Amino acid sequence: MGIQGLLPQLKPIQNPVSLRRYEGEVLAIDGYAWLHRAACSCAYELAMGKPTDKYLQFFIKRFSLLKTFKVEPYLVFDGDAIPVKKSTESKRRDKRKENKAIAERLWACGEKKNAMDYFQKCVDITPEMAKCIICYCKLNGIRYIVAPFEADSQMVYLEQKNIVQGIISEDSDLLVFGCRRLITKLNDYGECLEICRDNFIKLPKKFPLGSLTNEEIITMVCLSGCDYTNGIPKVGLITAMKLVRRFNTIERIILSIQREGKLMIPDTYINEYEAAVLAFQFQRVFCPIRKKIVSLNEIPLYLKDTESKRKRLYACIGFVIHRETQKKQIVHFDDDIDHHLHLKIAQGDLNPYDFHQPLANREHKLQLASKSNIEFGKTNTTNSEAKVKPIESFFQKMTKLDHNPKVANNIHSLRQAEDKLTMAIKRRKLSNANVVQETLKDTRSKFFNKPSMTVVENFKEKGDSIQDFKEDTNSQSLEEPVSESQLSTQIPSSFITTNLEDDDNLSEEVSEVVSDIEEDRKNSEGKTIGNEIYNTDDDGDGDTSEDYSETAESRVPTSSTTSFPGSSQRSISGCTKVLQKFRYSSSFSGVNANRQPLFPRHVNQKSRGMVYVNQNRDDDCDDNDGKNQITQRPSLRKSLIGARSQRIVIDMKSVDERKSFNSSPILHEESKKRDIETTKSSQARPAVRSISLLSQFVYKGK
């Protein structure tokens, strides 16, 4: 699209400007250039024929940008393809089909990212998409026009007539058509590049475009290649510039190339060149002022002298609609052109490719196609009058059965049997209303062993009224025992069900055990020895490991019989001595002031073994000779007995003597003798079972 390499050569005269420079002016906009740019955001939807409005949103955003800078847009859309550009259009069409096939294949394989690149290359901008933008322009009062052929020549014509003051486009062909001010590279911030034709003289000597005439510029472009001709192979803009400046005309340039023999000139190049020159200079456009088809520039008379020249000229600049034939063809005279139809095409009412069809909005067309997929068939014209069916014919009717005596007799007998059955049911329900109804309900479950029977009696048998029935039931509830099934099955949490029978004997045994524990505790307190080991409870109870089993047995809850009101035979066994463990000691029963309760041990609290060390210091080391200093240290491991602990008293005198044996060998021997004497004098006592790490200490007797 455009002339390859032309804009980079014009970089020295590209002026970065803002749209504020064109405040209050009208700028022509290449609509298809914006559509190509907007199609990148919805390439998949456009290629697959799905509805989308993303390209319309692009235009709306650009219109708001121009409105911000107080610039009035004038949209120009492409029309029908010009005959000179048919070869280029066919190549582009084939390329789009190839890219679409590649995109669909990649999309099916899961390569969606690569497929999107090919979808963007295969998008075809259609007049239906332009119609969507035209509808928006009509609603918002934005000026637009559909060119009969190329939008480039149409925009240049608007600029020549001073209808617009500049052209916004990405196509460099506009400079060849004669554009005076081209605005390119417009971004979302209103920043763009301006190229003015008046600045061509400022270009460097390497590319002196300002020294060439308009015809020579067209020749240079045709040599390097453009949309209308492929040019000569291996000839670029700089080479073409040199050839034009040296030989001026195309005939002399071709002769020089043929003479040198370095370049190959295609056979069709001369015809392509002549058609391109005519299309660049005299292409047909639509004049919005006169509302008729005109040429871009005035056609000179020498091009219309002969019939062959006229044919050649009008075939290159575009076919128009003939007034009489209503077909697009070569028309020599302006009076034979149907300007009214071209006006409708310019307004966007008719399709530029097929002016017999109205131009439809793409999105509306797809929405209608998706909502109604009805195939209309041709009506049958053979019948003169169509049969009109009444509305009842569309509903299903019930057909009447023919009278058959056998079927009638069978139906009559069935009805009689049904009537007899219903009458029997009614009699059974209504008769014997005052008879006692007994319903047996088996209430056997996993909680009860005996099945029970509930009797349902009629109210009238027990009394004449409901009040009499209430009085009878209240009196019976006090006299008659309640059945076992009607008793409450919930037992209070304070009662613990047991199967013990001899409650009195058990309570006596518990009291005896408790009194024995109290006596053992007193005896253990009276026989306290400073250097012995004895087991005590955390609360001060001096029971042994053998007594622990007895106390455990004493904690077994006792049972007693309790009866609920209204139950005569039902008895619930429970523990009436739950608080037996909180009773006072029997040894202090005579004295009320000195009675001490036996505190129970908490279930979740576990005591740790404590070590009490009795250390006798030497006379030389401390003034407090003979005084006992007791230190308390927690043991490292717990006792095997659940909530019990051990108290260990150790004579540390031997330990202190062992520490000083390293001072001299004499003291070492004395300490050994002293240890031997102490071990002989001490009496061995078996230690209580313990897993404490302090069990390695030697226990000493008195």
Swiss-Prot record:
Phosphoserine modifications at: 372
Binding site for Mg(2+) 1: 30, 78, 150, 152
Cofactor note (record): Binds 2 magnesium ions per subunit. They probably participate in the reaction catalyzed by the enzyme. May bind an additional third magnesium ion after substrate binding.
GO BP annotations listed: DNA double-strand break processing; gene conversion at mating-type locus; meiotic DNA double-strand break processing; mismatch repair; mitotic G2/M transition checkpoint; telomere maintenance; telomeric 3' overhang formation
Compartments where located: Nucleus
Listed Polar residues bias regions: 474-498
Residue positions binding Mg(2+) 2: 171, 173, 227
Compositional bias ranges of the Acidic residues kind: 500-518, 535-550
UniProt note on regulation of activity: Inactivated by calcium and zinc ions.
Keywords: DNA damage, DNA excision, DNA repair, DNA-binding, Excision nuclease, Exonuclease, Hydrolase, Magnesium, Metal-binding, Nuclease, Nucleus, Phosphoprotein
Molecular functions (GO terms): 5'-3' DNA exonuclease activity; 5'-3' exonuclease activity; 5'-flap endonuclease activity; DNA binding; metal ion binding
Location of region: I-domain: 114-247
Ranges where the record places region N-domain: 1-96
Cofactor section: Mg(2+)
Ranges where the record places region Disordered: 465-571, 660-685
Classification via Pfam families: XPG_I (PF00867), XPG_N (PF00752)
EC code: 3.1.-.-
Low complexity bias spans: 558-571
Gene3D superfamilies: 5' to 3' exonuclease, C-terminal subdomain (1.10.150.20), 5'-nuclease (3.40.50.1010)
Subunit structure, as described in the record: Interacts with mismatch repair protein MSH2.
Misc note: Present with 672 molecules/cell in log phase SD medium.
Protein function: 5'->3' double-stranded DNA exonuclease involved in mismatch repair and eventually also in mitotic recombination between direct repeats. Also has a minor role in the correction of large DNA mismatches that occur in the heteroduplex DNA during meiotic recombination at the HIS4 locus.
Name of the molecule in the record: Exodeoxyribonuclease 1
Gene it is expressed from: EXO1
